[in-house]
């Protein structure tokens, strides 16, 4: 039972860390380095 709980907590922590990193990359200071392919392509 305790090993199951620790596994669930570990998976939840990894998921939260990945989500936080994605939000930081999308909206934080690194977002200035992201490029929009639709703005780069002119018709």
UniProtKB/Swiss-Prot annotation:
Respond yes or no to whether keyword Membrane is given for this record: yes
From the Swiss-Prot or TrEMBL record, state where the protein is found: Cellular thylakoid membrane
Q: Which Pfam families match?
A: PsbN
Q: How does it sit in the membrane?
A: Single-pass membrane protein
Q: Which UniProt keywords apply?
A: Membrane, Thylakoid, Transmembrane, Transmembrane helix
An example GO biological process term is: photosynthesis
Q: Where are the transmembrane segments?
A: 7-27
Primary location recorded for the protein, binned into one broad class: membrane
What InterPro entries does the record tag this protein with? PSII_PsbN
CC annotations in GO:
plasma membrane-derived thylakoid membrane
What job does this protein perform?
A: May play a role in photosystem I and II biogenesis.
List the NCBIfam families hit by this protein, alphabetically: PRK13183.1
| Family statement | Belongs to the PsbN family.
From the Swiss-Prot or TrEMBL record, give the protein name. Protein PsbN
Q: Which organism is it from?
A: Synechococcus sp. (strain JA-3-3Ab) (Cyanobacteria bacterium Yellowstone A-Prime)
Lineage here is:
Bacteria, Bacillati, Cyanobacteriota, Cyanophyceae, Synechococcales
């Amino acid at each position: 039972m305790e090993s199951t709980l620790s596994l669930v907590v570990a998976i939840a922590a990894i998921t939260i860390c990945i989500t936080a990193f994605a939000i930081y990359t999308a909206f934080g200071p690194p977002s200035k380095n992201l490029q929009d392919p639709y703005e780069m392509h002119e018709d």
